[in-house]
Amino acid sequence: MRDATIARGAAASPRRLSLEELLSAHAGLRTVADRSAGLRLVDATDWLPPAWDDLAARSTLGDAFQSHAWGELKRGLGWRPLRYVVEAGDTPVAVVSIQERSLLGRRGGPLGRYTIHYAPHGPVLLDTAPEAVSAALEGLRRIAAQRCAVTLTIDPGWEEGSGLHTALSGAGFRVAARDVQVSRTAMIVALQPSEAAQREMLGHTTGYDINRATALGVTTERIDMADAAGREAALAEFYDMHSATGKREGFIVRDRDYELEQWRSLGEAGLADLWFAGLGGRDTGALLLHSGSLLVYFAAGSRDGADLRRTRANHLLQWRIIRWAGETGFAGYDMGGVDTHSAPGVPDDESHPLWNLYLFKRRFGGAPVVRIHAYEFAPNAALGLAWRMARRFR
């Protein structure tokens, strides 16, 4: 079994519990939804946030989007968070945070009891043995059926070709009508134990740019997200950078209150870091998420792009993040995607719209990892088909 060990010490809660201790400590809150055929669904919706996050966000394959904070954040947008531990033979094999909403809102009628389910970047596997994965997927099927879900959509971020998508097909899941995530191809840097070993992974010009930024006097800063006063001012400044960058480069930026609330929630949970770099000030910044053994690039912003090209501040920022992540105990740094729905796959020449972004990430030692599509499961085939058709023509 691949147990749910804490991925790294610095971000973990002060009191770390084993799986058995966690389940025992919260026995009074547990509701057994199904115990047939050796499978048990433990309702963990009311668990305290640190206990849930130790499994869902900080275990080896954990993900920040499966955290307690992320589920509660979506409550304000009309979703109801549901959290479950799936056990097989009294052994936890997976956890999942599901966002649920009514199919028809407040309207009644024959379809009034039906719901829509989405598990962002879930489920989180605690055991990757084939029989454990099958049990985890069966648990998801039963949750969807019992909660009258028309469809359950999952996008767990499993690597394409890993064999896990075969288990999905065998469990009655099918490729979703549309992907949830903008990009399926990420660039991941394998973190090394020493600076010398990490530098060997850099492209020649990248090492030069890092040295140039250092010589010019560019400085980097990591914000203490536990310090409320410093955090709020820094997040507000970062939002201004992020919004300005969105206008320059043409990507969508959510409204200030929503973005600040999601960043704040993840920061308070110890699942996000905010960094800045600049020459005589804060010129560029990056927000990063703690997802199991990976540090994940989530959002970025900068002031004048031309000045950044001159100072190479972003090169030094990425390098300092990489070194900090390696020293903290992360196994890899996910630098983010390099493809889109309209231009899928690893860029192979300059005709790809994200070719330059791909080169930038590759020069830090990033290697492409293609993740599977989103998958759907419909307990009722007829309703599921109707839902797919309705979404296709929306």
Language-model features, listed with the residues they occupy:
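Active-site/acyl-donor-binding loops of N-acyltransferases
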Residues: 2-38, 45-46, 99-100, 171-196, ...
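A conserved beta-strand-loop-helix scaffold within acyl/acetyltransferase catalytic domains
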Residues: 33, 38-89, 93-107, 156-161, ...
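Short, flexible active-site-proximal loops enriched in glycine and acidic residues
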Residues: 108, 112-114, 145-151, 176-182
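Conserved acetyl-CoA binding element of GNAT-fold acetyltransferases
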Residues: 110-127, 294-304
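Residues at the N-termini of beta-strands
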Residues: 116, 149-151, 294, 332
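A gly/proline- and charged-residue-enriched helix-loop-helix capping module
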Residues: 120-169
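Aromatic (often tryptophan-rich) hydrophobic motifs at membrane interfaces
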Residues: 135-142, 260-380
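Short catalytic-loop micro-motif centered on adjacent basic/acidic residues
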Residues: 151-154, 222, 334
